[in-house]
Amino acid sequence: MAKYNTYTLENGLRIIHLPSNSQVVYCGYDIAAGTRNELSGEEGMAHFCEHMSFKGTARRNAIQIINAIEGLGGELNAFTNKEDTVYYAAISKEHFSQVVNVLTDIVFHSQYPQHEIDKEVEVICDEIESYNDSPAELIYDEFENLLFEGHPLGHNILGNAEQLRTYTTADALRFVRRNYRPEKMVFFVYGDIDFKRLISSPKFLDVPSGKAERGEIKRGLNEIIDTSICSDPLPPNLGGTYTIEKSTHQAHVMTGCQAYAYTDPRRMTLYLLNNILGGPGMNARLNLSLRERHGLVYTVESTMATYGDTGIWSIYFGCDHHDISRCRKLVRHELDRLMQKPLSPQQLIAAKRQLKGQLAIACDNREQFALDFGRSYLHHGHERDLETLYQRIDAITAEELQTVACDLFAPDHMTTLIIK
């Protein structure tokens, strides 16, 4: 793989570039401003500002923003999660300079006009309603809210309709000026561009300079606030079973627990364990048991997410209401197997081979790969390196897998949410 180029501008903005011989360039701003950066009373604000950033700057209205990139055959998009807001684009390399110009404009110079807010809030409220109508999606947010109740990590990314309708231009500017700061973001580029020209681009000079000073929160648009990760104490792991009644045709069940932070060395062990148990392969143990052997579910999967100071691991399945208990017992059986019996040498080799193959295929998705190495550099200060991942996977032992299983999968450690 080609070597990464990195550079930090005087204003604190970090730039990371990975060369490629493709005619297409993938690039964007990854900003450390997700839902966990919302203060009390700002729930949903990170996602709200992401939407509103496309509604006009001092130089471009909403239509001009879209046409500036899509009119050249490019793609412009954005998303918000718990720790990030990302604005990104794909464009043919001859139009790369135009993309830098537009992305920089919407990130640093959006105006959030009230008349556009009044319209876009209703769009987001429709998005919330659509989400609420899909319990298979809703359960992920409800489960995270349950595990992290009272903590910003438990905030629903979309927010709630009642609060969204109170937001104003001043509210949006306050959040953005606190969080959209050069030292809190990375500009990532994956493509065939001249790195020296990139870091000397005048487009990057059109960015606020200087770092925020730590201090007390002040009222007004130019408040100063600590820009570090939210330091609110994490709630204790919950445990128990909780039910949301929605009169659904199918029952939706999620069980899991708080898990490991990105920097925890056990993270990669859980990554392999998760793939064995409920990864995307049809040979995952949960799929073989609940779907192939017993025909009780269409979808069963386990997932994990890592944050700066914690993580989350969970299993999801959907089944008929009368099969909930049986499915839960089968899930418990698979968890107990991993706790009680280490993998054989042959099983361990096969599991590692499968995960490494999946990672290789995932890296072939160029857009997702660019997003991944941008996030890695923003939050952890290093590049995404497939060979290093392979080495970490190869070093995992059967005993380490069993230890992590015992640490996380104990019955009294698990929280279960049922929507039915």
What are the residue ranges of the model-derived segments?
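Charge-rich, well-structured scaffold segments of protease-associated domains
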Residues: 3, 8, 64-226, 233, ...
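Active/ligand-binding-proximal structured segments within catalytic/core domains
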Residues: 12, 19-69, 265-277, 285-288
